[in-house]
């Protein structure tokens, strides 16, 4: 294990705690320095939080003339409900999306220039449309006779015999194509309130020849508005001048994606670089455009390719033949996401889509209501695998490229260079399982993987360092395991970090990790020498608990455990200590108790060398080194390192005093207070496990009066 002088300690809950404290400050109106007025409703917030999440507020508060504003009035067309949802998202990282408020949230996000939220809303809508599309798609003849033809649907349904001059919407101004555009996302049921839909913006027309359209795959009906339209490689084809300006009738107060010509794209980008410093990143091999529909291949290839977390979520919603290059250009009035915008949120911390890990430096944000922090598993993983904490082999990425994603990506166009394996990994940071299923990764495993990397001091590979999120670990090429910690400790992984060749041990049990013939349980990190024992342990330990207590809600996997549990209700303690006479209801508790008399302390802290009698004491001690206090009080917000301390603290709010003296009838909130009272007032000996009762014969006659 690395020495304290050269180690880096990762606080896994720091980011979530800071955000939680900021939200509490906002709810108590502490240090809020701006009031946002939306349709006569006022919202108090902190400027720094608004700047960090919204491009609109970023541009306002960075302006020297507007940075001191204390009251900001937003456009009256903005929905207060949508702004309230987005404001809560800024402080909690949770976006409350429902079919009734999706349009209000998306419209407000477009106005606030929160592109990552807009993309999430669009994918939410596309997912809803994809479910309704098969039942709503009319036959070809009925569809061609309908008046609701859209440009891409015309192209998909037109016959091959249509000549090029009769192509609909070809070489027509962008404003004329508005007649074919129905309201945005018309297939989704919306609430009675009307929100600005931005359907009056011009749609890009088709600049492809008949041969190109014939060879291109047809666009699915469930995706009516593609994010980009790439130009063919024919340099003789130019973009009409009509597309170089947005529609004049658009209100300037509304945020929308501008459409630029290739000539003015360069000065616009230079202008945005003046306001926002864009960190340099790797140059992509595949260009793409999101906000600018028409861009030459040579210009787009010079744009930075930044893997965004919206594309992580997009893998759950996009069709299987979706193009790989979904990155887009940021509008001039919107900051880069690496500057002031966070990664895209997930809908729920408990959903499968939410099981993603931020590997770009910010720890995984966990719900403050969950008091469990898997620090013990993190500690065990560091201690048990301290010999294998070297850097991850860089060469293993090349061998795993064929297993990263089950999607069949289309071949790149002729004008673009073929994608290298490194670029493919950069384009698709999400690592799916080999079966394509979105399997949930335990939080403890992700914490183990993150802390192990930080303690080892090894940077990620080039493909992983630019990917903000990791959904699934790569599958081990030797033993087939997908455990997050397996990539760090598998002895079969080829690489220069291991000093000697390790024996090959294959495992057919895909849900476990193996090392030198030892099988690990991915749920609790238990070790087994045989695969059959691991399977039996998985079925018995991590399955349903059939034996339930008839007096409480406790349930158990074994009948004997239930019988032992019932002694809690009956008060029976058949196991007695031969030295001090202490009684226990379980033999394991008696065994642990005997270590007090023998002086045995088998559990050692690998950081400071302290030893403990019980493993629970070691678990609590490890939290001192990590600096974590995972148990918050829901009433006052005070955080505690131990669960028992939190339970004792809650008695302050509830007024409960469960410990009482039988002779004085005094009640105490904590057991330590009762012990002190018994020692001082009744002369009782309280350093044993014997119940703290003092007989009347042993009491001096004057002591009861003192109480």
From Swiss-Prot:
Phosphorylated by MAPK1 in response to antigen receptor activation at Ser-334 and Ser-344. Phosphorylated by ATM in response to genotoxic stress. Phosphorylation induces its degradation by ubiquitin/proteasome pathway. Residues 331-350, 425-452 have a biased composition (Polar residues). Disruption phenotype: More than 50% of lethality by 6 weeks of age. Mice have infiltrates of inflammatory cells in their lungs, as well as multinodular lesions with eosinophil infiltrations into the spleen, significantly more T(H)2 and T(H)17 cells and up-regulated levels of inflammtaroy chemokines in macrophages, but, express low levels of memory CD8(+) T-cells and, in spleen, GC B and T(FH) cells are both undetectable. B-cells express 10-fold lower levels of surface IgM than control littermates and macrophages divide faster. Its main location: nucleus. One of its GO terms (molecular function) is chromatin binding. GO terms for cellular component: Golgi apparatus; nucleolus; nucleus; paraspeckles; replication fork. Expressed at least in germinal center B-cells of spleen. The modification N6-acetyllysine is found at residue 380. The modification Phosphoserine is found at residues 334, 344, 362, 405. Residues 299-315 have a biased composition (Basic and acidic residues). Pfam families: BTB (PF00651), zf-C2H2 (PF00096). Residues 275-350, 405-469 are annotated as: Disordered. Residues 409-420 have a biased composition (Pro residues). A zinc finger (C2H2-type) spans 519-542, 547-569, 575-597, 603-625, 631-653, 659-682. The keyword Transcription applies. Residues 32-99 form the BTB domain. Interaction with corepressors through the BTB domain is needed to facilitate the rapid proliferation and survival of GC B-cells but is not involved in the T(FH) formation and BCL6-mediated suppression of T(H)2 and T(H)17 differentiation required for GC formation. Transcriptional repressor mainly required for germinal center (GC) formation and antibody affinity maturation which has different mechanisms of action specific to the lineage and biological functions. Forms complexes with different corepressors and histone deacetylases to repress the transcriptional expression of different subsets of target genes. Represses its target genes by binding directly to the DNA sequence 5'-TTCCTAGAA-3' (BCL6-binding site) or indirectly by repressing the transcriptional activity of transcription factors. PANTHER family: B-CELL LYMPHOMA 6 PROTEIN ISOFORM X1, ZINC FINGER PROTEIN. This is B-cell lymphoma 6 protein homolog. It comes from Mus musculus (Mouse).
């Amino acid at each position: 294990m690395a020495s304290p002088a050269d180690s880096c300690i990762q606080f896994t809950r720091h980011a979530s705690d800071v955000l939680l404290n900021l939200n509490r400050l906002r709810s108590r109106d502490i240090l809020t320095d701006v009031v946002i007025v939306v349709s006569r409703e006022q919202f108090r917030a902190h400027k720094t939080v608004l700047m960090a999440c919204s491009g609109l507020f970023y541009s306002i508060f960075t302006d020297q003339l507007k940075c001191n504003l204390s009251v900001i009035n937003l456009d009256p067309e903005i929905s207060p409900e949508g702004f309230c949802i987005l404001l809560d998202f800024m402080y909690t990282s949770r976006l409350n999306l429902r079919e009734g408020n999706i349009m209000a949230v998306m419209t407000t996000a477009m106005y606030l220039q929160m592109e990552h939220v807009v993309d999430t809303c669009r994918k939410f809508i596309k997912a809803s449309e994809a479910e309704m599309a098969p039942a709503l798609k009319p036959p070809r003849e009925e569809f061609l006779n309908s008046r609701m033809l859209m440009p891409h649907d015309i192209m998909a349904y037109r016959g091959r015999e249509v000549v090029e001059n009769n192509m609909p919407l070809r070489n027509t101004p962008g404003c004329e194509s508005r007649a074919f555009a129905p309201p945005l996302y018309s297939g989704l049921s919306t609430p009675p309130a009307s929100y600005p839909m931005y359907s009056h913006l011009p749609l890009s027309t088709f600049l492809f020849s008949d041969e190109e359209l014939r060879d291109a795959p047809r666009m699915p009906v469930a995706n009516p508005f593609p994010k980009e339209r790439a130009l063919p490689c024919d340099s003789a084809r130019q973009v009409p001048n009509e597309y170089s300006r947005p529609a004049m009738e658009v209100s300037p107060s509304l945020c929308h994606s501008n459409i630029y010509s290739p000539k003015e794209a360069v000065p616009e980008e230079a202008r945005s670089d003046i306001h926002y410093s864009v960190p340099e990143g790797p140059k992509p091999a595949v260009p793409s455009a999101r906000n600018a529909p028409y861009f030459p291949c040579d210009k787009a290839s010079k744009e930075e390719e930044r893997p965004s977390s919206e594309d992580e979520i997009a893998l759950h919603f996009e069709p299987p033949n979706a193009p790989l290059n979904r990155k887009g250009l940021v509008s001039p009035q919107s900051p880069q996401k690496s500057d002031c915008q966070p990664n895209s949120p997930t809908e729920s911390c408990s959903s499968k889509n939410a099981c993603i890990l931020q590997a770009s430096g910010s720890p995984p944000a966990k719900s403050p209501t969950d008091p469990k922090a898997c620090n013990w598993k993190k500690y065990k993983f560091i201690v048990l695998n301290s010999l294998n904490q070297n850097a991850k082999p860089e060469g293993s990425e090349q061998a795993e490229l064929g297993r990263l994603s089950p999607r069949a990506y289309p071949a790149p166009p002729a004008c673009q260079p073929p994608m290298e394996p490194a670029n493919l990994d950069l384009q698709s940071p999400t690592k799916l399982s080999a079966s394509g299923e979105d399997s949930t990764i335990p939080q403890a495993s992700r914490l183990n993987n993150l802390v192990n990397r930080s303690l080892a001091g090894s940077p990620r590979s080039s493909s992983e360092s630019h990917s903000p999120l990791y959904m699934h670990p790569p599958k081990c090429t030797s033993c087939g395991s997908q455990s997050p910690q397996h990539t760090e400790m598998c002895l079969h992984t080829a690489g220069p970090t291991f000093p000697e060749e390790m024996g090959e041990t294959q495992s057919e049990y895909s849900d476990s990790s193996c090392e030198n013939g030892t099988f690990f349980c991915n749920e609790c990190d238990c070790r087994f020498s045989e695969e059959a024992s691991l399977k039996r342990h998985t079925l018995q330990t991590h399955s349903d608990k059939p034996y339930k207590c008839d007096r409480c809600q406790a349930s158990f996997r074994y009948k004997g455990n239930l019988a032992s549990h019932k002694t809690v209700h009956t008060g029976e303690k058949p196991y007695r200590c031969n030295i001090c006479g202490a009684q226990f209801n379980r033999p394991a508790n008696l065994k642990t108790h005997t270590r007090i008399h023998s002086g045995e302390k088998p559990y050692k802290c690998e950081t400071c060398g302290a030893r403990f009698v019980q493993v629970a004491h070691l678990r609590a001690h490890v939290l001192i080194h990590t600096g974590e206090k995972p148990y918050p009080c829901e009433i006052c917000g005070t955080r505690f390192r131990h669960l028992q301390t939190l339970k004792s603290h809650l008695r302050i709010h509830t007024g409960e005093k469960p410990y009482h003296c039988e002779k004085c009838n005094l009640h105490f909130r904590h057991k330590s207070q009762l012990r002190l009272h018994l020692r001082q007032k009744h002369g009782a000996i309280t350093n044993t496990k014997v119940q703290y009762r003092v007989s009347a014969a042993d009491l001096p006659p004057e002591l009861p009066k003192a109480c």
